Amino acid sequence: MNFGLFFLNFQPEGMTSEMVLDNMVDTVALVDKDDYHFKRVLVSEHHFSKNGIIGEPLTAISFLLGLTKRIEIGSLNQVITTHHPVRIGEQTGLLDQMSYGRFVLGLSDCVNDFEMDFFKRKRSSQQQQFEACYEILNEALTTNYCQADDDFFNFPRISVNPHCISEVKQYILASSMGVVEWAARKGLPLTYRWSDSLAEKEKYYQRYLAVAKENNIDVSNIDHQFPLLVNINENRRIARDEVREYIQSYVSEAYPTDPNIELRVEELIEQHAVGKVDEYYDSTMHAVKVTGSKNLLLSFESMKNKDDVTKLINMFNQKIKDNLIK
């Protein structure tokens, strides 16, 4: 099991954007130190609201890669459906070269209809657009060149510069059953959405296994990623209240057709690492097992006391270290 961090960068009431970004930078600088054992940090993409203030994660990632020396830095959900794949390929090659292979590319279809509309993409062909973007991008990353002649792109063979110097690790956000099935056919690892229920994540995993088997894909070395919100407090009520306050607006925005947002929020609180220190381990290990995950990504952003965040990161780091020694 590998451990990492992910950042949603929500801007709650009472916090400035500078405060949100400084918290991310300070935390990343901490876990990059030699005596910390977190493998990677991933940054989320989100547009047009304070439920995630980084609309261009690769820009933030370039800063964090320059800030750090050891840890991998990457995107949690770089949306390719609303971006030009050649541009993402160029950015990826640059980040791969300048970080000496520490960049991780987490890709996503668009999960919000309002983003598809704003960027003038047709919802009716969304899956096809996503797949077309990926094929161009992957060709650029694996061969250093790409070309296209399909319903969405048409351009001659070009060199995508600078060329990647390593095999950039890719993950696909489990944004829909169609995307999960497509990823399974290609043997690409998933990153589950933190805001999906465990039942939804498990359903995706079981479908992934079935499709992979149908296509003779060996899943033994596929390392899915499980994102976990963490808020540990001696006062269980404080932990739950902080998480509820932190995620309520995003969940309402992300699941507009859900008839009972309050129930979904409470279910998420139960399924993430929220509460006292002895309340999260068994449920977390169960969730990791039933989703086939080999990477556990942690977010401490809902915690308001930053000294407590540091203490909790140190606690997790010691547990990781102890396990490595064993």
Curated annotation (Swiss-Prot):
Belongs to the bacterial luciferase oxidoreductase family. GO terms for biological process: bioluminescence. Heterodimer of an alpha and a beta chain. GO terms for molecular function: alkanal monooxygenase (FMN-linked) activity. InterPro entries: Alkanal_monooxygenase (IPR033924), Bact_Lucif_Oxidored (IPR050766), Bacterial_luciferase_CS (IPR018235), Luciferase-like_dom (IPR011251), Luciferase-like_sf (IPR036661), Luciferase_bac/NFP (IPR002103). Light-emitting reaction in luminous bacteria. The specific role of the beta subunit is unknown, but it is absolutely required for bioluminescence activity. CDD domains: Alkanal_monooxygenase. The keyword Methyltransferase does not apply. One of its GO terms (cellular component) is cytosol. This is Alkanal monooxygenase beta chain. Its EC number is 1.14.14.3. It comes from Photobacterium leiognathi. Keywords: Flavoprotein, FMN, Luminescence, Monooxygenase, Oxidoreductase, Photoprotein. The keyword Protease does not apply. Pfam families: Bac_luciferase. It catalyses: a long-chain fatty aldehyde + FMNH2 + O2 = a long-chain fatty acid + hnu + FMN + H2O + 2 H(+).
